[in-house]
Amino acid sequence: MDELKPDVLQVHDLGMSMTYMVSKWARKRNIRCVLIQGTYNTTLKPGLKQLECLFNRTFGKAVIKNVNAIGAKTKAAAAYVQKYYNKDVSITPVGLDESKFVGCSTQSDFRKRYGLENQVILLYVGVMEQRRNPLFLLDLMKAMPDHFSLVLVGEGPLFAQVKDKVKKDSIHNVVILGKRKQEELPAIYAASDLFLLASSYEIFGMVIMESMYFGTPVISTSTAGADTLIDESNGKVIDGLDVNAWKKSILQIAEDQKLLSEMKKRCQYYIANNLIWDKASDNFEKLYFA
């Protein structure tokens, strides 16, 4: 790195050995160094939990001493740092790169193509894996009225199990699209009424931002990204995976067209005015050049 002669260095996460080494290198050379924290929960794995806490209180102490400023992707990540050290932490959520959607149309015959013209569309986009709880979404759909349909976009370790459960349990109101190209997503987001994210852990959750950007309110479990991006005016955060609680929240929003319309507008406004990169980068610049 000596050859690069950086003006500012950004390191990630308190508990990383690379973070310690780079921040130490920067301090020796009087180079401004900024820590950005994403992790917000201590690991639950036996043994590793104690090791993580020990690292954070030893090498982590050196990291805090070495860096000039601290940012966190979410409020939960900020609290994680402050659990160990009484330091100022700025909230620096990542931004949405609009350029990847340039030329992508939000207009399509998506509803007609899949026979969903008169349906309330609930959408999930992401990896079919354990921490995202796609099987819970299927249990939820068994409790929803017939005019609600769930569209699943993505593949992953649980993909086959999801397909098997839909068939075995005769869940007729689910459309499984599998993996889709990036340019197809805007039309799918725009055609949907609500986005569902039942994750047990999300450092941020880019799909939340993408969905809100295209005007689709998100109902999510309480994870770091959801708690930072969503409030009662633009979506809903629910503690836990209780089918009745999720059903109640979905019905309250989806069956009130005025409320749903207002939420859609607030979603788009919030992302466009705060979290596209042109806006979000302001928070990082304040840390870099303070």
Task: Write out the residue ranges for each language-model feature.
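Carbohydrate-associated surface elements
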Residues: A76, G95
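Conserved acidic donor-binding segment of nucleotide-sugar-dependent glycosyltransferases
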Residues: D231-E232, K236-V243, Q252-K258
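Aromatic "clamp/platform" in nucleotide-sugar-dependent glycosyltransferases that forms part
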Residues: S200
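Nucleotide-sugar donor phosphate/pyrophosphate-binding loop at the beta->alpha transition
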Residues: R32, N41-A62
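Conserved donor-binding/catalytic core segment of Leloir-type glycosyltransferases
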Residues: L116-M141
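Nucleotide-activated donor-binding/catalytic signature segment of Leloir-type glycosyltransferases, i.e.
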Residues: K163-R180
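Short alpha-helical donor nucleotide-sugar binding micro-motif in glycosyltransferases
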Residues: K179-R180, A187-S192
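Short hydrophobic beta-strand element within catalytic cores of glycosyltransferases
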Residues: P217-S220
